Amino acid sequence: SQHGSPEGLFVALTGLWIRRRNFFLGRWIRHGGYWPDPKLRLFRKDAAKFEDRAVHEDAKLLSGNAGELKNALVHHSYPTLSDYIDHINRYSSLGAEMVGAKGRGFSVLNIVVRPLATFVYNYFLRLGFLDGREGLLLHLYHAVYVSWKYAKAWELGRGKQAGGRTT
């Protein structure tokens, strides 16, 4: 190696990408955008920072170079449907605040077309159907998340206009 040793290589890097092997209902999801799912998760604190987002937060490398870990992180994120439904309920509420801040909310495009397009893109074009029943459920419920996010943004905006509570 140009750095002389594995330790020297690590010193030259400011971050490491980790591929995630995502499992849904016990099945490794290999398609639909869920593999290799690289995340910058090991980095020097002065070389990267997390983006200021409530949902789907990612670290961004500010300086230096990042390597990639050889092995993937096994990520058993949603062992049951209840776990995933709880997740999409939480994340759709957080996402609603983000899209509401941008002035987006209820429209046929956001409530129907975006979720449908999300499902078609991930399930068919990105081959999510190759992940069997688990792939179908994952991509179907992800589309539901998109719909809920915009419906909840509308609900938040409606409550603000009326001066009432939306919870």
Set out the residue ranges of the language-model regions.
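Short polybasic linear motifs
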Residues: Q161-T167
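Catalytic-site signature of metal-activated, phosphate-bearing donor transferases
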Residues: S1-G4, G8-K160
